[in-house]
Amino acid sequence: MMIQKAILHVLDFGTSMCLLSQKELDLSIETVYDYVSKRVEKSLHDPAGRTGIFYETSAVKRQLETYASQDLSFQELADSLAKAVFESLKLQAEADTTDLLVTSYKDESQREGIALFFLENRTAYTHRIMTDEDGVYSQIIEYQAVLPGLMQKAEAYVFIDLSDFTLRFVDKKRSINGEDVYALPELILQCTTVLSGKETVKKTEKLLTKVAEEYGKNPVEALAKGKQYLAQTAETGSNFAPQAFGEAAFAGEPALQGTFTEKLKQAEDIPKEVKVESRFAERTGTVHKIKTDTGIEITFPSAYMENPDFIQFFTRPDGTLSIELKGIGKIINK
């Protein structure tokens, strides 16, 4: 990962001013480079990122194509993008001052891209050392315009691959002109929207649980089997396919597989397959967590679900569930 250029524009919606920086950020300053690069690296692998494709009528796409052909400078591109964002967001019901970070980068595969981050200003407090006739003392002071820390996510962002102009983005709904919209795909970028890998997995799991419960099957067992398939996608680098997830979860049960397939067809927002960030797939697929209505929480490897030597679920005559953990040599308090 390498940050090539970056610029920070200020979108002051309170005063209706779009303050364009006339200079790029100085990336030779370690603090500046660290903030920008870590912001890019963290968001680039965010499993919550949705994907999309520009519509042919997108003005932003035309600007990016001009930039990619070197007929537009980075400064000119960043200025144009900032103006487009400002014009789209200035009519939102609740608008705070937002810094727009525009960066040019190369990823691990040396593919060039442009990234935009919406960094909503926050209030922060710190101390100041003061001196008066009584001596030295400290005082608490407030800062009104503070960038989000690196442990805090940007409220919205987009990555654009300049080789094929594909998109990855995260956005939140905003009230603009009385309507709740996702401003990035609908107003600014003008692109399609496909659920993120994380969203697709969660929706598929919810659908799977519903089918299992309809047939009186333990959804925990079904989900644990499905998660083994999810873990395999991390190992092989293949896309996540909800249909294959259901087939793995209901292996050997054609009736449940058929019902799941029908419900999947009805769920039009769930894609047939989607790329899932490998670290999310591995973390989510290899471990299963459950919480009972009695307040007990259990975390166990998903693969153990098919091994009765480690864990078993039983339905008692009164309809309640029992969980038996086996082969335990030692219990450690945490």
Regions found by a protein language model. Give the residues of each.
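C-terminal structured domains
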Residues: E247-K334
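Long, hydrophobic alpha/beta structural blocks
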Residues: M2-T284
